[in-house]
Structures are given as structure tokens and as C-alpha cells.
């Protein structure tokens, strides 16, 4: 049958875990960048400073969105795997 789905549960699980780990790494980058940006406020003032901090805030907002998307992708992959395994087990019980 050409409409069958074949998957490797171990590989899918590893992928979901890896994606979740990447979200954690991105979050650490976010925290580090936000901390360093906030530390600059004491030393960086003047006409261009507000533009810099606005740009940093926009970049951090985008990074936060990426972190949430990557984390959700890992979580969703894990849920789909759990559901696929559950479906396989339920179908096996029918025979």
C-alpha cells in the first residue's frame, strides 16, 4: 500500500528531544543578550541610544517568538509520536 506511514519511534523521540533542547539553548542566548543589553543602559546614552535599545527590544521579541515556535514544534512532535504509538497499539489489539 502506498498510503502507509512508516516511522522510527526512537528517531522521532530523539528528534523531539533535540528540538526541545534547541529551544532551551535559544532561551539561554535570549537571557544573555537581554542581560547584556540592560547592562548597557548605564553606559550608553544620547540621541542614538534609544534607537539602539528599540532595535534590541525588537530583536529580542523576535527571538522570543522563535523560542516559543521551536519549543512548540518539539512538544507537538512528541505528542504526535505518543498518539501514533497509541494508535498502533490499539490497532494491534484488534487482531
From Swiss-Prot:
Intracellular or extracellular location(s): Secreted
Keyword Nucleotidyltransferase: no
Annotated signal sequence range: none
InterPro entries in UniProt: ESAT-6-like_sf (IPR036689), T7SS_ESAT-6-like (IPR010310)
Key word rRNA-binding present: no
This protein's UniProt keywords: Secreted
Pfam families to which the protein is assigned, alphabetical: WXG100
GO cellular component, one term: extracellular region
Coiled coil: none
Family designation: Belongs to the WXG100 family. ESAT-6 subfamily.
Protein name listed in UniProt: ESAT-6-like protein EsxC
Origin organism lineage: Bacteria, Bacillati, Actinomycetota, Actinomycetes, Mycobacteriales
